[in-house]
Amino acid sequence: MSGSSLASVTNQRLDAARRLLQQATEMDNDWMTQSLESSALFQLRSGLNGLLQEVKTSYSLPAALDLDLLLQAANAKGISVPVLNELALLKNNDQSWLSQLHIAFQAALDCQVANQSYGAGVELIGRGSDAGTSTKYILSSLTELVLRYREDAAEY
């Protein structure tokens, strides 16, 4: 798959998440809002995988779509990939949008009640009942990271 079509797939995932969150704010019933937010989380996680696929292809990394494996592959090639380094820092910060995405996605996947899915010591921006505010924050943060990565990649 070419770089432009990889970018297109990532863009489609992020746009789908944005549209699902918009629909969620227009809903009157809680179950539908929760369903749309869960669907948006899936699209966001898929968008993150899309970004990882773009990086993997751009840097010719042989690893699977796993942040740690991609970092190891980059280190083995003797290269530093700024977007992977940034994601690693975010992953290690329990308060980051990336950690929130992983927690919320896993909770949705496991059909857990949102408020019970978060770790007791983790303070999140929002928890499921915030009308998608935290999910919108994740969307804007991921979108910003994708755009910065592409801008940096275009300079080289």
Positions of the model-derived regions?
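Acidic, Ser/Thr/Gly/Pro-rich intrinsically disordered interaction regions
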Residues: 70-156
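A structural signal for long alpha-helical coiled-coils and helix-turn connectors
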Residues: 21-25, 55, 150
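Amphipathic, well-ordered alpha-helical segments in soluble domains
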Residues: 13-23, 43, 50, 138-141, ...
